[in-house]
């Protein structure tokens, strides 16, 4: 119920590992995320895009603690009355892709439709998609745990090159 501040791109978190805003749960979440095996982020769809709150939350969480998410499976879910779900999923999946997170899919796009929350269970295909998504997430997390326990190393990450579209 507290408002979420948007990321100021102040880059203080790059030095401290924590966001400068401390009273809205983002830092507490990233601490808990260190011990998580995977993530599902869901959003209502407003005007054919994710809610501003989830953007504020994810911008700050991924900027301040991006390595916490690395090599952990992620899934996005969008809920709408009608349109905008695929655009919303695309926007949320960007956080996973840039953070080296495998993206969990399902048997259809990870979306549920309904005008109000009580409508969602009536979306038979949406509910089936959510059940399959849950099964796929569990399977991925189990596979990753077996790999980790067996000593399979994470892939090396090449760094150093950064391109700017402005050349002088």
Predicted features and spans:
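Short connector loops at secondary-structure junctions
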Residues: 1-7, 106-116
């Amino acid at each position: 119920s507290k408002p979420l501040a948007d990321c100021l791109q102040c880059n203080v978190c790059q030095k401290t590992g924590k966001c400068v805003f401390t009273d809205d749960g983002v830092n507490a979440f990233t601490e808990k995320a260190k011990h998580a095996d995977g993530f599902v982020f869901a959003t209502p769809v407003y005007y054919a895009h994710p809610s501003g709150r989830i953007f504020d939350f994810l911008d700050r969480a991924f900027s301040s603690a991006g390595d916490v998410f690395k090599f952990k499976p992620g899934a996005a879910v969008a809920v709408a009355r009608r349109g905008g779900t695929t655009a919303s999923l695309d926007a949320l999946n960007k956080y996973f892709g840039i953070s080296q997170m495998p993206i969990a899919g399902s048997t259809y796009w990870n979306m549920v439709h309904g005008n109000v929350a009580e409508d969602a269970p009536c979306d038979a295909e949406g509910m089936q998609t959510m059940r399959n998504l849950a099964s796929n997430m569990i399977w991925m997390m189990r596979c990753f745990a077996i790999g980790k326990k067996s000593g399979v190393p994470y892939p090396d990450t090449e760094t150093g090159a950064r391109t700017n579209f402005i050349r002088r």
